[in-house]
């Protein structure tokens, strides 16, 4: 699968996770609604589904994993930043085939697209601190 298809999968996953966080609907319903309403022709659907299900089922663990690296409590994070950080923490902790620099850079790009003005700086700071601990020194 092309890297662009994975990037699109991450973009779609962040949007769907944002919707899930706000609506508190079942993740399967959010996925179904998202896929039926959005243009997903250039998306790695398998990866999108893995990210969505992985983050949704492990959100609490991912929050605990990132908490030591945050400058504020998780419930004080914006919903967009929370979705992006959860996705990146999932990739860092569960997808060792994704180089940690790729996971961080993709999260920064997502924050530039979807986040508030300087959220990409916040995301970068959190992930730069978290990556060595989460990956235990693996590059």
UniProtKB/Swiss-Prot annotation:
MF-aspect GO terms: RNA binding
Name under which the protein is recorded: Transcription antitermination protein NusB
Function: Involved in transcription antitermination. Required for transcription of ribosomal RNA (rRNA) genes. Binds specifically to the boxA antiterminator sequence of the ribosomal RNA (rrn) operons.
Native source species: Pectobacterium atrosepticum (strain SCRI 1043 / ATCC BAA-672)
A biological process from GO: transcription antitermination
Similarity section: Belongs to the NusB family.
Superkingdom as given in the UniProt entry: Bacteria
GO cellular component, one term: cytosol
UniProt keywords, alphabetically: RNA-binding, Transcription, Transcription antitermination, Transcription regulation
Keyword Transport: no
